[in-house]
């Protein structure tokens, strides 16, 4: 079996491919055992591919856990200049987060046409690809949870209770002003993505990540695809060697 891992800033997702049907799970990077769901499968794993944007210390901790569990080399998959007809716009591809590249690869393999991929995690990334597979560029923005945490920490005197309600009306209390303001900002992002999709003539918008449903609820007209980073890794794994 092949173990695929998407290790983000705060959470990780994993998938076991080659089991007749994929087995999937998730964990928190800071936990002592973020891969506890794999406890019954380690001996069956013969290959490990990882896409990560985690800090070096978090990556090293994960690396040790993987080596202790599976006893096979860990292969790290980073952004590339090109793969399967998809080409990167970055002059220095090592500066692109691996998760963005692998999500784009999954989108490209899925449609082979122009598209946007929106990954709504701790940060929100937006990337555009034309019909020829050329990455046109993208954006990186703070996600809903990151913005909320920032206000709690850096503007502690505001004092507000978190709400998951997605309301963009003007607030009538401090809590409403903050929570509605975050939804209002995100709705503005949604509108900009729609404008860009029209301007670039994109055929599809793919939406993935933990806050995908929230962006969809705020009006983003997109196909929600769970685990696009893992899909991209699985495509790389199917090619054999890196």
UniProtKB/Swiss-Prot annotation:
Range of residues in the leader sequence: none
SUPFAM superfamilies, per the entry: Actin-like ATPase domain
A single cellular component GO annotation: cytoplasm
Record text on cofactor binding: A monovalent cation. Ammonium or potassium.
Catalyzed reaction equations: (R)-pantothenate + ATP = (R)-4'-phosphopantothenate + ADP + H(+)
Positions of the catalytic residues: 99 (proton acceptor)
Provenance organism: Marinobacter nauticus (strain ATCC 700491 / DSM 11845 / VT8)
InterPro entries in the record: ATPase_NBD, Type_III_PanK
Keywords attached to this entry: ATP-binding, Coenzyme A biosynthesis, Cytoplasm, Kinase, Metal-binding, Nucleotide-binding, Potassium, Transferase
Encoding gene (name): coaX
Binding site for ATP: 6-13, 122
Stretches that traverse the bilayer: none
Stated name of the protein: Type III pantothenate kinase
Binding site residues for substrate: 90, 97-100, 174
Cofactor: NH4(+); K(+)
């Amino acid at each position: 079996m092949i173990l695929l891992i998407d290790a983000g800033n705060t959470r990780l997702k994993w998938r076991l491919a080659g089991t007749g049907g994929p087995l999937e799970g998730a964990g928190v990077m800071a936990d002592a055992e973020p891969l506890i769901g794999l406890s019954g499968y380690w001996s069956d794993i013969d290959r490990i591919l990882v896409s990560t944007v985690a800090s070096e210390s978090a990556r090293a901790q994960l690396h040790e856990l993987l080596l202790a569990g599976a006893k096979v080399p860990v292969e790290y998959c980073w952004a590339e200049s090109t793969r399967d007809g998809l080409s990167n716009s970055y002059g220095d591809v090592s500066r692109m987060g691996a998760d963005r590249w692998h999500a784009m690869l999954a989108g490209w393999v899925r449609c082979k046409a122009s598209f946007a991929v929106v990954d709504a995690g701790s940060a929100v990334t937006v990337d555009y690809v034309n019909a020829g597979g050329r990455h046109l560029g993208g954006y990186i923005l703070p996600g809903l949870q990151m913005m909320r945490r920032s206000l709690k920490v850096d503007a502690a005197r505001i004092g507000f209770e978190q709400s998951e309600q997605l309301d963009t009306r003007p607030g009538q209390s401090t809590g409403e002003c903050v929570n509605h303001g975050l939804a209002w900002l995100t709705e503005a992002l949604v509108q900009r993505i729609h404008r860009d999709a029209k301007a670039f003539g994109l055929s599809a918008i793919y939406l993935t990540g933990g806050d995908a449903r929230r962006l969809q609820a705020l009006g983003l007209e997109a196909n929600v695809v769970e685990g696009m980073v893992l899909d991209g890794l699985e495509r790389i794994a199917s090619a054999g060697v890196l």
